[in-house]
Amino acid sequence: MSWTRVVVLSLLTTLLFLTFSSVVDSAAVRDDSKAGHPKGPARQVFVPESEASNFFKRRSRRSPRSYAELQAEQRVKIAANERWREYNEEQRNEHENYAEEARDESDERSRETHEQIREYHYDGLYPRYHWFH
């Protein structure tokens, strides 16, 4: 029974907090607010009609780009290409290191195996250079 009391108490506390919170006031729909004068974030999203039409007049779809816009776009492309190149170079280096380590381990194992075979087959009666003729 004590856990139900804890749950009910926590729910009531949350409800009380949400009731008096300023976040809920800004999210609630009010009847007395005027739609003509937006406040807060709405003012940043919606602009007057004159500013919106000037924005589209200033830069249409077919208008040539300014030199600054072209330069900024080129800088973004160059930076992206550089990041891509660095990433691929890092991946290639990691793969080369892994392949080199694998080759070294394989060479070491084969060398040890060959040494063991030589020692096993050598009986001391003839020089070693006669083995593989």
Curated annotation (Swiss-Prot):
Residues 1-26 form the signal peptide. Its main location: secreted. One of its GO terms (cellular component) is extracellular matrix. Proteolytically cleaved by a furin-like convertase to generate a persistent C-terminal fragment found in almost the entire cartilage matrix, and affecting osteoblast differentiation. Sulfated on tyrosine residues. It comes from the Eukaryota. Residues 27-62 form a propeptide. GO terms for biological process: embryonic skeletal system development; regulation of osteoblast differentiation. It holds the Pfam family UCMA. The keyword Secreted applies. It is found in: Secreted, Extracellular space, Extracellular matrix. May be involved in the negative control of osteogenic differentiation of osteochondrogenic precursor cells in peripheral zones of fetal cartilage and at the cartilage-bone interface. Belongs to the UCMA family. This is Unique cartilage matrix-associated protein. It comes from Sparus aurata (Gilthead sea bream). The gene is ucma.
